[in-house]
Every structure is written in C-alpha cells, then in structure tokens.
Amino acid sequence: LYGNTGTHDCAPATGNPYALMSEIGTPGFGLVPDGVSEVTVTYQIAPPRTVAVNRNFFVLATTSRTAPPCGVQWLDPTGNVKGTPIGCSFLTLESPELGEYRAYVAGKLATLQAQVASLSGAIASGNLAAAKSAWLNAHLTWLEIGQDDGAYGAFGPLGGDIDGLAAGHPLGTADPGFTGLHRIEFDLWTKRNLRTAATDTVRLRQLLGQLMKAPLPTYLPATAAGIGNWLLRPHEVLEDALRDSLTADDNYGSGTDLASITADIAAVRTMLAELKPSIDPVAPHLVANASAELDSLMSAIGATRVNGAWVSVEDLPTRQREQIDADAAAAAETLAPIPDLLTSTGSNSPD
C-alpha cells in the first residue's frame, strides 16, 4: 500500500521505506495475491478500515483522514485473516506514557520507603494503634503503584516478597517465605506481636532497598513485551481485587480490603489518564465509561464505612457486597479491551 507522503513511520514487509498512505488525502493503493477478498488497514490513532479487493487491487481513498495507516491484514472470502504483511508498532505511541508511569512509580516508592520507616518507628515505640495506622498507609501506597503481586507485576518475585500472600507456601503464615506487608499485617492484627512485627519490618525495608537498587526501566522496559504487560495492568489490577480482596483471601486480620480497592482504583485512574491520548481515537467512550464505573465503585465502597472506619468484606451485608462486586466487575470488563486496542499487529507484535 503506497501513498504520497514523506513519513517513514511505517513500511512494507519488504523494507521499502514508503509510508502506506498520504496524510494529506492522496489515495493509498496496493496489490494483493489471489484469494484475498478484502483488506483491513490498521492505524495507531484511529479505528481500522476494511475495503474490498477488485482484481487483486484495492484503493483506500481518504480526503480528510489525518492519521497515517501502519498495518495491513489480508482477509479471505470468509473474513478470516489470511496474512498480515505489515504491522503497526505501538512502541512510539506508548513509550512517553510509560515514562510518565515510571515517574509516578518512582514517587510512590520514595513515599513508601518513608512510610515503612514510620511503621518501624511506631512498632519500636510499642504503640500498636500507631503501628496499624502506619501499616495501612504503607500498604495503600504500594497498591497505588498498581503492582500487587498478581497484576502482571513488573517487580516479579521481589514484588511477591513485598506484598505476597501466604497461599502457596508450605507452612502458610508460619512459613519463612511469607514476608512483606501482609506478614506484618498478620503480626499486628492476628498475633498482636510487636516484636515479630519489628523483625518482619526490618526484612521489608531490606526488600524495598533491593527493589530501589535497580533503575525502573529494568522492571518497566519500553519494549514490546514490557509495554504489552503494562497495557494489561488496568484490567488486571481490578481482576486481582475481585479475586483476592473481595473474597477476603488477602485479609490477614486488618479488615481493610475495601481500603485496598480504593488504592487499586487510584492506580487504574492514573494509568487511564496516561493512556487516554492513545485510547480516545480508537475507543472514544472507553475512558469516560470506565471512569464513571470507577466512580460508582468508589461510592459503593464509601457507603460501607461506619463512623469513618473500614468494615471487613466478610462483615458486609449481602446487598452491599454484591453491589461492590458488580461495580468492580463492570469496570474490569470495560478495561479489558485496552491491550487489543493499543497493541501492535503483525511482525511488530509482542512475543
């Protein structure tokens, strides 16, 4: 597919450095092999278009479109994809947004380190109530990163050590491999043991120090796979909330699962704001719809608080719990198409 333009952003699989179509309205055209009935042209910042093939030739006339195409799929008579000779790369578009997210994560990690230091001080002072409050602040900051252990966490096993669950460890909560924020939660609420909490907080500080040693691009690389995983995260964060928090599987005594979900929502809102410029051209209503659903979820959670205190998921009336489940599921479903909308096709797709 060729056109009259000087941009070299996209090129045929042969390596010919011509753009696929003019950005100023000159028709694009191309030849296809036998058996191809239609051609779908994909764009990075506009919905795809499908045009008919006539005697192995097709024309894509556009008098007003300003988005250059960057991918082509050949379709057989049944509409199935017969081949993808050219693919779009999302690396150019999403790399700046990933950079914004990295800066956000760096700020949260710095805050988290200070909060864990405060937690350590509260434990050392023997003030259980202050230690619980400091723990909650730290835990919510971690979740606001959007990196809890199941959400395609970029921090890998280290992230699991910082905020992993006892499930999967042979000895459960007694297993030495169960470390991090939830281990300290178990110490403070279930065991009410400040001495053990102090030891486990030292370990948490070591884990955070280890995490901070490597540059963030190590964990959040601007590669096809790295960006692909990041694009999964808005949906996966809420899916984790449905699986772990709304079932109370990650409650080790604090009863703050609903507070955790508010932090998850904050993480999702941040990522949506960063991705909005890329999402809007291909799905104009997605961000607005997701934001409205997140508002409903926040309202449903807010309605559960009693005199400002958090209520455990297990203690919620059935109607309130079902409403929160439904709102979280609706938002997660709305967010699910983001990777398909923004990832690339053909030879440029993630491995």
Give short role names for the model-derived ranges.
Residues G6, C10, C88, H235:
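Functionally engaged cysteine thiol sites
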Residues E23-G25, G35-C88:
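Ser/Thr-rich low-complexity repeats and stalk/linker segments
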Residues S89-D351:
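Mature extracytoplasmic or organellar-lumen-exposed domains after removal of signal/transit peptides
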Residues G3-F29:
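Extracellular ectodomain segments of secreted/surface proteins
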Residues Y2-T5, I45, S89-L91:
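Short intrinsically disordered, low-complexity coil segments enriched in acidic
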